[in-house]
Curated annotation (Swiss-Prot):
UniProt protein name: TRPM8 channel-associated factor 1
Secreted keyword on record: no
Organism name: Mus musculus (Mouse)
Top-level taxonomy: Eukaryota, Metazoa, Chordata, Craniata, Vertebrata
Subunit and interaction comment: Interacts with TRPM8 (via N-terminus and C-terminus domains); the interaction inhibits TRPM8 channel activity. Interacts with TRPV6.
Cross-referenced PROSITE patterns: PEPTIDASE_M60
Length: 924
């Protein structure tokens, strides 16, 4: 099939003017299909003639039938028929409604004849858009490889019929919509036309009186909110970007969890996680959704085998289902989770021709397993769903109640907000609903990840954003001059990032103030720099490998690796500041400043808008060894490796390497901080040896081998997404914490509770964690252990919260309320573990954490808190050979009767400190 660009050239060959009939008032066309493209567009951006493809065939759509009867348009009509023909000898049939077209074609030497109906002997069929009896035949004719030339207007038809839903009832739309082209009831202006040399843009937004409010109301009938609070899942956020797609459940930040869309003759509903198919509170909505998808046909509802729980929920509401492994030919609705082998073409045609699709899936786990690969481009669910105007993103949403759109209120939608952004940017005035511009920026950046090459529906958005952002200089966000996120300037930062990552020309994105770390000031090396990178990864997850190189901002770099490395699933990452700030009210830096991409070719060009340290992301179990990496456009950055870098070499690097960020590394920890702070370190060796001692203690308590298979990372940033520090890979902290990380004397005298707290968070395992109670508690065991065993700082001095009088008061307050897990959190929860440690030492913890870590997946540890807590009681009791059930009961733990009975054979723990508390506790 020819590309839209090539097709446009063929259709416009020799066309020098649009001489349309003066007394004909056409309608505006709406284009949503990935194969659809505009041909004739007026000066206000309305599409009047378009083309598309469906199945093996093609269609050309005119917004008034008179366009197909106008002899002055003979050049275009001849081109259209020629493009629609599958071969030069294909027969052309013309419906009697377009009889004059036969003579126009004949005058140009093209034979055609009147045919009352489309049939298989024809290669092209020409008809107006008002025929109600032939719609199914016309769709199948095109699908099998036929060419369709169709014209009509819907605004007049709308005034005459009983059904005012033009998009879904107008006869022409029952045909052309399968290819993503719709006749609307908007009148089109015919005062001025320009013959385009290149394909014109598709408008961002076509406003139709025929909106989707009836569909939304039907789906949400009787629904107050969509509550998934206790669903035990984190759904993916949905990007709703199609003109006929609409959100159904939104959080306070306008993040969408469930959405629906019309596509062709069919309908789609998407949830951000398959678990939502099993949530009892969503039962009424699930019933509404399946009935809406069925469209009143009372047809066969097919549920994918893996989702059989949904069948039970639907049965309660009187809907019978058929459980099948795949879509069946007689299905009316198909409920499923898309996997790697999803039949994209089959399912898209199923919907286009009237089927209903109910999809549940999340993409954040796929994104975690595939760093540097956009889920919008490669996630199996999105290969199917992008075309429907709904995409699954890697951003997760917190489980909770999601509000539903209310009648008469405006709801955030990417396209409508982008259209308003366009108006504001053009006029420098306007008003958008609160929070919409803060959402537009990241949504736009996400949308730009959808592959757009030769897909006009997406290319038009790229072109618009390039045009808008090239008119104005990019804001520069700093701590001294922050940028408000929910405004045009904030949106520009995210949109510029998306454009840069999509390959747009960086010369269009000029900042208000030139960054001192941009290529203009840092001046990358004229010759390429080659470094050797260790690409062996014995760990169980991907890891970053430092290169010691920094990429200046607003730069395109060329990266080269050997052929063997290009096929090893390596990724390139520019930048280490991974926190997503899109929900921050003020921005001290761009909201998303790293760029990841696949290193899938021996030589690759990569765009860098913000600059940053360069890393290779190495997949788990990689055994590549040392890989030579050659980079053109980089500068060197200070990098110190314990045991490898000499003191003299370190001094030289600080003097000669201009990179503004540097790293201090051991085999177990890597600290990333500004170079300005590193200049205070004449000799990092004592500091890093201390860090290695602390990391050894962290590993020992957690039952982990040492040296670590992969080093932990701590990165300082001008702004992070949450808290003073947070765990993860990497651990993130504020710039104010840098001295705490790199000042050995300070560490030895005052300790460093915060960083070790986050290292402890990274040690937590779901098998022995009881969220939310212990989330901020058990990690502090590592703080106490490291401070006491490595730094020699007792717990009472390491943190004021562990001063003995404070601890005792906390326990008594807890007991005075009646011991209950409901109140057992944070420092109170930690006290339980500290009492055990003070009685039995650290060894039981070390042995127990090791035992948990070494458990095989076949042992199937419990997943709910009550069972996990009882397992902990049993295992700790066995470790210390004491019956600890009474101790934990005193703390209000939900000890199961059978567990208490099973531990009765063990000796009583006579020194149980909780006995003393209970004996001396004032009655409450």
């Amino acid at each position: 099939m020819a590309t839209p660009s090539a097709a446009f050239e063929a259709l416009m060959n020799g066309v020098t003017s649009w001489d349309i009939p003066e007394d004909s008032v056409p309608c505006e066309l709406l284009l949503i299909g990935e194969a659809s493209f505009p041909i004739m567009v007026n000066d206000v951006g309305q599409v009047l003639v378009a083309a598309s493809s469906y199945g093996r065939g093609r269609m050309v759509v005119a917004s008034h039938e008179d366009f197909l009867l106008e002899s002055q348009l003979f050049v275009f009509l001849v081109n259209a028929v020629g493009w629609l023909r599958s071969s030069p000898n294909s027969a052309i049939g013309v419906h009697s409604s377009l009889a004059p077209l036969v003579k126009i074609l004949e005058s140009c030497g093209i034979e055609s004849k009147i045919e009352p109906e489309v049939n298989d002997s024809l290669g092209v069929y020409c008809i107006d858009a008002y025929n109600e009896t032939m719609t199914d035949k016309l769709v199948q004719f095109v699908k099998r490889g036929g060419g369709l030339l169709i014209g009509g207007e819907a605004w007049d038809w709308d005034t005459q019929g009983d059904d005012d839903r033009v998009l879904f009832a107008f006869p022409g739309n029952l045909v052309t919509s399968v290819a993503g082209v719709y006749f609307t009831d908007n009148k089109a202006d015919t005062s001025f036309f320009k013959v385009s040399k290149k394909m014109p843009k598709i408008p961002i937004l076509v406003r139709c009186d025929d909106d989707l409010s009836d569909d939304r109301d039907e789906l949400l009938r009787g629904i107050i909110d969509l509550d998934i609070t206790n669903s035990d899942c984190f759904p993916s956020q949905l990007l709703v970007h199609g003109s006929l797609a609409f959100p159904l459940g939104l959080d306070t930040y306008h993040g969408c969890v469930i959405a629906a869309a019309r596509y062709g003759r069919g309908r789609v509903v998407v949830t951000g996680h398959k678990v939502l198919f099993t949530v009892g509170k969503l039962g009424p909505f699930l019933l509404n959704a399946v009935r809406w998808l069925d469209g009143g046909r009372k047809g066969k509802i097919v549920v994918q085998t893996e989702l059989r729980t949904l069948s039970g929920l639907l049965a309660v509401g009187g809907i019978d289902t058929s459980i099948e492994p795949h879509l069946t030919s007689d299905a009316s609705v198909y409920c499923f989770e898309p996997t790697s082998d999803v039949g994209v073409k089959e399912l898209q045609e199923f919907v286009a021709e009237g089927g209903g699709l109910f999809v549940g899936t999340q993409a954040w786990w796929w994104a975690f397993k595939n760093p540097g690969v956009s889920p919008l481009a490669r996630f199996p669910g999105n290969l199917l769903l992008n075309a429907f105007g709904i995409s699954i993103t890697s951003q997760s949403l917190n489980p909770g109640p999601f509000r539903t759109p209310k009648i008469g209120t405006r709801t955030y939608h990417f396209r409508s907000t982008l259209a308003e952004f366009q108006v504001i940017m053009g006029r420098k005035r306007g008003n958008v609903e609160k929070g919409w511009l803060a959402k537009l920026g990241p949504d736009g950046a996400t949308f730009l990840q959808i592959p757009a090459e030769e897909i006009p529906a997406y290319m038009s958005v790229h072109r618009l954003l390039r045009k808008l952002l090239s008119r104005y200089r990019l804001p520069v966000a700093t701590r001294e001059n922050p940028v408000i996120n929910d405004c045009c300037r904030g949106a520009m930062l995210s949109l510029a990032t998306g454009l840069a990552h999509s390959g747009s020309d960086l010369s269009l994105l000029i900042p208000e103030i030139e960054d001192v770390y941009s290529s203009r000031y840092l001046r990358p090396s004229a010759s390429p720099i080659t470094v050797n990178v260790n690409c062996t990864n014995p760990g169980t997850r991907y890891c970053w490998m430092s290169t010691g190189l920094y990429i200046p901002g607003r730069q395109v770099i060329d990266v080269s690796v050997p052929e063997s490395a290009a096929s090893a699933d390596l990724k390139i990452q520019i930048g280490c500041h991974t926190d997503d700030l899109t929900r921050a009210s003020k921005l001290f830096r761009g909201p998303l400043v790293i760029n990841r991409c696949c290193l899938d070719k021996p030589t690759k060009s990569i765009t860098c808008l913000w600059g940053g340290l360069l890393y290779i992301i190495v997949p788990q179990n990689s055994k590549l060894g040392s890989v030579p990496l050659t980079v053109k456009g980089a500068v060197r950055a200070p990098f110190y490796k314990l045991g490898e870098t000499s003191k003299e070499e370190w001094k030289r690097r600080l003097l000669e390497y201009p990179g503004p960020w540097g790293e201090l590394a051991t085999d177990n920890i890597i600290l990333t901080v500004p170079t300005a702070n590193l200049r205070t370190l004449e000799n990092p060796e004592p500091l890093l040896r201390l860090w290695d001692e602390m990391m050894q203690a962290v590993a020992k308590l957690g039952g982990e081998t040492f040296p670590l298979r992969l080093p932990q990372r701590i990165v300082a940033d001008v702004q992070i997404s949450v808290g003073w520090m947070h765990a993860g890979y990497p651990i993130m902290c504020h710039l104010e914490s840098v001295q705490e990380l790199i000042n050995e004397k300070l560490i030895r005298t005052k300790g460093l509770w915060g960083p070790v707290h986050e290292l402890g968070r990274n040690q937590q395992r779901q098998e022995w964690e009881f969220p939310p109670h212990t989330t901020e508690a058990t990690c502090n065991l590592w703080c106490v252990y490291v401070h006491e065993t490595v730094l020699g700082i007792p717990r009472s001095r390491a943190n004021i919260a562990l001063w003995p009088p404070v601890r005792e008061k906390r326990v008594r307050i807890y007991l005075s309320k009646g011991p209950s897990v409901k109140h057992w959190n944070a420092w109170t929860a930690l006290e339980t573990y500290l009492q055990l440690q003070e009685a039995f030492g650290w060894e039981p913890f070390i042995r127990l954490f090791t035992e948990y870590r070494n458990q095989t997946t076949s042992s199937s540890p419990p997943s709910d808190n009550v069972d996990k807590m009882n397992l902990w009681v049993k295992m700790f009791s066995q470790q210390v050979q004491r019956n600890l059930a009474p101790f934990f009961e005193a703390w209000g733990w939900p000890i199961q009767k059978e567990v208490a009975t099973s531990l009765a054979y063990l000796p009583e723990w006579k020194e149980n400190i909780m006995k003393l508390y209970l004996l001396t506790q004032m009655p409450h």
